[in-house]
Design a protein with these regions (language model features):
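Intrinsic-disorder/low-complexity, polar/charged segments enriched in Ser/Thr/Lys/Arg/Asp/Glu/Gln
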Residues: 3-9, 16, 40, 52, ...
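Hydrophobic ligand-binding cavity/cleft-lining segments
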Residues: 1-39
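Hydrophobic pocket/interface hotspot
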Residues: 19, 29, 53, 72, ...
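Short, highly charged C-terminal tails/helix-capping segments
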Residues: 141-148
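Glycine-rich portal/gate segments that line the openings of hydrophobic small-molecule binding cavities
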Residues: 41-84
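Beta-strand/loop substructures that line and gate deep hydrophobic ligand-binding cavities in soluble
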Residues: 82-133
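Structural motif
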Residues: 13, 75-77, 105-107
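Generic structural detector for well-ordered beta-strands
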Residues: 7-13, 44-46, 56, 71, ...
Length: 148
């Protein structure tokens, strides 16, 4: 699928296991996934193949929210996560597929994200910007080495 697809690449100064865990832990997701100006609530997260998740983003300025959820289709810890998801709003139809790959590199983890099947009403560039904001927050979560 080449249209309605977002592709992202980032190198993080953290091991793949830690970066991967940030995609599978409800508290971590709520901290880093919402782009600027949004909050996130994770309602359900069963991180296993065939497991489901449900969450919502809320626009902090207006209070309006958007729910979405999906199913984990592939899960190889520290290497690859693939899930499908869909919005609750009928004006945002269809199913998206997101594939995240983690690869060990000399300074940490190379992260690649491909999100396919965006609804036509969501500009790919806007979605890409949102992901970029989220990935800045992800780096702030996973890169610090804080002793106990």
């Amino acid at each position: 699928m080449t249209t309605n697809t977002v592709r992202l690449h980032r190198v993080l100064r953290a091991p793949p296991a830690r970066v991967c865990r940030a995609f599978l832990d409800a508290d971590a997701i709520a901290k880093w996934l919402p782009p600027d100006g949004f909050t996130c609530k994770v309602h359900q997260l069963d991180a296993k193949i065939g497991g489901n998740y449900r969450m919502s983003f809320t626009n902090f300025s207006t209070g309006s929210g958007q729910g979405f959820g999906g199913t984990y289709r592939e899960l190889v810890p520290g290497e690859r996560i693939r899930y499908d998801d869909h919005f609750d709003d009928p004006r945002l139809p269809g199913e998206m597929t997101t594939t995240i790959t983690f690869r060990t590199v000399s300074c940490g983890t190379e992260l690649q994200i491909v999100q396919e099947g965006l609804p036509d009403v969501i500009p790919v560039e806007q979605c890409c910007l949102g992901w970029q904001e989220s990935l800045v927050l992800l780096a702030k979560l996973v890169e610090p080495e804080i002793p106990d």
